[in-house]
A protein has these predicted regions:
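Extracytoplasmic beta-strand/coil segments of soluble accessory domains associated
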Residues: 107, 111-147
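Gram-negative outer-membrane beta-barrel transporters
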Residues: 413, 417-419, 509-511, 531-619, ...
Length: 685
């Protein structure tokens, strides 16, 4: 029997009355709390309220456990709508599951979601290409506390974020085109990372070490008063690499602050991310000695007024630096120097939401400016500029574009029926064209108390990245005449939710045109960016989550069982091209999770992942292309053991327990079995 289960009084919090016959018996001999739901705004949109019953085990500070209905606010529309009425699949990964998972980065964590394709190039969060439902890594919006940090240079760097895993309160994954919610970059979906705020005076640390000279130190301090809360965190990680030239070093600094008053609430955040890593065969297997050095600075401020009409303004700024070395050492005679890139993004948005007798209406506007300076990307500059933070190098080229988006959405909420209609009106200065409209409609109908049927239709767009447009190198060539990608998507699904079981199944079809991809006709050719005629996705995904303890036996050793599966079929007209990204999609993915207690504070979490990728890659031998090799399916097993006592948590984890050989991207082997161990400690002051 778990120590905490036998010595801690269990508190049950009721936030919903379901009139079940057994409800009274489940409350016997327990402390009962009555909870009230509150809502706040994420992004410039108001979120929907997600309710999911979940057992909360003792946290690492040793405070009392509670069994309650988990209430999470997620951004699934521009106006607030309850989750049981929402018409999108939103995957929420809370802090408790993050702490229990055998991962070292956000990219690792997203591997366990069935609908997400994570293609790692290196470990420790160095670089990964992340896509949703058969899209590409450039087709998702990446947000930090509602601020869009998608990188206009390339999606390779969108996850250069200044936060540690211990900073994260939850991660929200919105599946499917969401341009009318998040703007043009949410072509295939969006990932919103929500960080913890300073709600109490606490100091915490999280540290670990492992094979391949891996180690990391994290520390955070929270401070709170009646109306003011803030959190400051820092983290540093390093590894010697699992094979030659896969070493890395990474630094994160992050500050977040909240100010609450009767009239309005305000949020501020700032961060810095610094990475340097060996990039063995990242972009071409002909050059295994590549290296990448990146920096990102980030600032934002926002607020939310109280009253009948809620205004949510936000301003933000981010600057990203990248030094890419084709030769980390011993360069070839023809090599003229490294590539230097600097992207700067700043923007402002305003959203207004009100509820009246005909429903809830939300409208807003966003301005976003994206610029690049480089010695490779863009148009020739009049005067060269020295590269900041570097001893050598000059910017010779640049480009800039502005995007203005107008949003309008209305929700009709009836007892069993929900209707949401909205439109994005988008103008981009690089297109020299009129405003383009991207509408969408979502509808759902509740069947009985626990089942909801839903359907949606949405249009979306994505602008080419600066890399798509301008990059030229030994193995790649951009195309300045690229058109924006456009798509039309349909989705139908069924959701089933009870206090112990949550399940959904969704079928989707996305019809795309002018899809951008890096392609070549023969293995010996270089990659060129082109608008493919069409790339259409047809598929479905399903998920089932079971909480056995909610059936009545709160001492049952199994805490959670979760199963997920996603299937995609891609119909493409590539005219015989070899594809680098879009055409080697993840066809099958199965995930399983088991979380259970062991004995006296010990618990374990197991993850199983099996996936089968379509397409092939060009196999290299002796640094030269040899033949096309189909991607082989593989299975991975990861596990983590935790021991908790009061404010201390000790843990050990094993990744790739079966020591499988596998590739996410061609010619870049992924790590074999990897052991790590560490501890977390926190205390109030």
């Amino acid at each position: 029997m778990n120590y905490w289960e036998s010595h801690t009084q269990v508190a049950v919090r009721f936030r919903r009355f379901d009139r079940k016959r057994y409800a009274a018996f489940r409350s016997m001999h327990k402390v009962i709390n009555i909870g009230v739901v509150t809502a706040s705004t994420l992004l410039f949109a108001l979120p929907d309220t997600a309710q999911a019953q979940k057992v909360i085990e003792p946290n690492r500070t040793g405070e009392e456990a509670s069994v309650e209905l988990e209430e999470v606010e997620v951004t699934a529309s521009r106006a607030p709508i309850a989750r049981n009425q929402a018409t999108k699949i939103v995957t929420v990964i809370p802090a408790r599951e993050i702490a229990a998972a055998p991962v070292t980065s956000i990219q690792d964590l997203l591997e366990y979601a069935a609908g997400i394709d994570v293609r790692q190039r290196g470990e420790g969060g160095t670089q990964a290409d992340i896509s949703i439902r058969g899209g590409t890594f450039d087709q998702i919006a990446v947000l930090l506390n509602g601020v869009n940090l998608s990188n206009p240079q390339t999606g390779h760097y969108s996850f250069d974020l200044p936060v540690n895993l211990s900073d994260i309160e939850r991660i929200e994954v919105v599946s499917g085109p969401s341009s009318r919610i998040f703007g043009a970059s949410a072509f295939a979906g969006a990932i919103n990372i929500i960080t913890k705020t300073g709600k109490e005076n606490r100091i915490s640390t999280d540290n670990y070490a492992g094979m391949h000279k891996l180690w990391k130190l994290e520390a955070a301090i929270n401070h709170a008063t009646t109306h003011f809360g803030q959190r400051l965190s820092a983290g540093y990680a390093s590894s010697g690499g699992y094979i030659d030239n896969t070493d890395f070093k990474q630094l994160n600094l992050f500050w977040q602050s909240e100010l609450k008053s009767e009239e309005a609430d305000f949020q501020f955040q700032a961060g810095y991310n610094d990475k340097g890593y060996g990039a063995n065969s990242f972009y071409s297997a002909s050059y295994p000695n590549q290296y990448d050095k990146t920096r990102r600075f980030f600032l934002s401020a926002g607020g939310e007024t109280h009253g009948k009409i809620k205004f949510t303004p936000k301003v933000y700024w981010t600057r990203h630096f990248d030094r890419y070395e084709l030769f980390r050492s011993d360069p070839a005679d023809w090599y003229t120097g490294h590539n230097y890139h600097e992207t700067e993004v700043f923007g402002a948005n305003l959203n207004a939401t009100t509820q009246w007798k005909l429903g809830r209406t939300s409208m807003g506007v966003e301005f976003r400016n994206e610029g690049v300076k480089s010695n490779v990307l863009g148009k020739p500059m009049k005067e060269p500029q020295d590269v900041p933070f570097e001893k050598e190098g000059q910017y010779l080229k640049s480009d800039n574009r502005s995007n203005i988006s107008y949003f309008l959405e209305h929700n009709v909420l009836l007892r069993r029926f929900t209707l949401s209609v909205g439109v994005l009106a988008n103008y981009n200065s690089a297109l020299n064209e009129r405003i383009h409209f991207y509408p969408g409609i979502d509808a759902s109908y509740r069947i009985g108390d626990n089942v909801r049927l839903y359907g949606s239709w949405n249009r979306a767009l994505r602008m080419p990245t600066f890399t798509d447009l301008y990059y030229e190198g030994k193995t790649n060539k951009g195309n300045p005449d690229l058109k924006p990608e456009e798509s039309e998507a349909f989705e139908v699904g069924l959701k089933y939710n009870t206090y112990f079981l949550r399940a959904h199944i969704a079928g989707f079809y996305r019809k795309g045109k002018n899809m951008i991809d890096w392609v070549k006709e023969k293995p010996e050719d270089i990659w060129e960016s082109q608008n493919l005629t069409k790339v259409d996705n047809l598929g479905f995904e399903t998920n089932l989550s079971l909480l056995p303890r909610e059936l009545g036996n709160e001492r049952f050793f199994i805490r959670k069982i979760e199963l997920g599966y996603a299937f995609i079929h891609q119909d493409k007209d590539s005219e015989g091209y070899i594809s680098d990204y879009a055409l080697d999609y993840l066809k099958h993915k199965f995930t399983a999770q088991l979380s259970h207690s062991i004995w006296k504070g010990f618990s374990a979490t197991w993850y199983v992942r099996w996936q089968d990728r379509a397409g092939s890659y060009t196999k290299y031998e002796n640094l030269k292309p040899a033949y096309e090799e189909p991607y082989a399916p593989y299975c991975l097993v990861d596990m983590k053991v935790n021991w908790e006592y009061q404010r201390l948590n000790l843990y050990a984890e094993l990744n790739n327990l079966l020591n499988s050989t596998y590739y996410d991207l061609g010619n870049i082997p992924q790590p074999g079995i990897w052991f790590k161990a560490g501890f977390r400690y926190s205390f109030k002051y």
